[in-house]
Amino acid sequence: MGSTSTPASSTNRLQDKVAIITGGAGGIGETTAKLFVRYGAKVVIADISDDHGQKVCNNIGSPDVISFVHCDVTKDEDVRNLVDTTIAKHGKLDIMFGNVGVLSTTPYSILEAGNEDFKRVMDINVYGAFLVAKHAARVMIPAKKGSIVFTASISSFTAGEGVSHVYTATKHAVLGLTTSLCTELGQHGIRVNCVSPYVVASPLLTDVFGVDSSRVEELAHQAANLKGILLRAEDVADAVAYLAGDESKYVSGLNLVIDGGYTRTNPAFPTALKHGLA
C-alpha cells in the first residue's frame, strides 16, 4: 500500500559507520541490517538463532561488511563479547540498535498470567536493553560520541486490553531507560533514542499468536487511524536509520512514535458518536 523508496542523495548517510543490531536474525532487525548496509555501514548482527543469523548475513553482503555473533542479551558475558568482537573487527562502535524483544505467552488476565513468563519477558526486554546500553557506553564514552537506539512500542506509553501487562511494563521501562541514559550519556556526546511502532506483521507476532502476516495486517489496518497504508518493517528501519545517523545529530531522548496518529485518537469516541446520532 505504500513505498519505501530511498532518495539518491541519502544512499551514503551511514558511510563508514559501524553498527551492532541485536535481534538481527529476522523482522525489524533484519530489515534494518539490510538498510544500514545499503547506506554504507558495517554491521554486526547478534541473535540467539545462529542459523538464521548467518543466513541473513550471507544474503546481505560479504563478511567484511556484515557478520554475525551469537549473543543472549540477558548474559553479561555474551554482550561484552559482542561489543569486544565488533571493536576487534572494525576498530570502533558508532551505533547500537537494541532491538531484542519478546511477547508474553500466557493469558492477559493478571490472575492467569504466569510468574516465570513475567520474569522471562522482563529479563529479555529490560535487562537485555540495560546490558547492550552498558557495554555500548563502555566503548562510546572514551570516543566521546555514539548513538544508541532501542525498539520500544506504542505500549511504552499506552495500554490496551489484550496486550500483556508484562509487555506493557517492559516497554514503559525501555522508554524510561532511554530518558535516563540520555541524561547521563549526553555529557559524553552520546545520543540515546527509541522508536515506538504500531503493529508490524513480524515473526514476533505471527509466531506467538499463530496467525499469518496477512491476518495481522488486516486486523492492524482495521484498527489503524491512518488508512490506505500499512506499517512495514522498512518504515521502522527508516526511522532507526534517521536516529542512528548524523541527520539527527542534535536529537536525543526522543521516543519516535510510528503509529499514523493511532495513539493521538480515541477510537471509542467516533464509534459512540456514530451510534448516538444513528
Swiss-Prot record:
One of its GO terms (biological process) is response to wounding. Homotetramer. This is Secoisolariciresinol dehydrogenase. It comes from Sinopodophyllum hexandrum (Himalayan may apple). It holds the Pfam family adh_short_C2. The gene is SDH. Induction: Transiently induced after wounding and by jasmonic acid (MeJA). After an exposition to UV-light, first transiently induced before fading out. InterPro entries: ABA2-like (IPR045309), NAD(P)-bd_dom_sf (IPR036291), Sc_DH/Rdtase_CS (IPR020904), SDR_fam (IPR002347). It catalyses: (-)-secoisolariciresinol + 2 NAD(+) = (-)-matairesinol + 2 NADH + 2 H(+). Mostly expressed in stems and rhizomes, and, to a lower extent, in leaves. Disulfide bonds: none annotated.
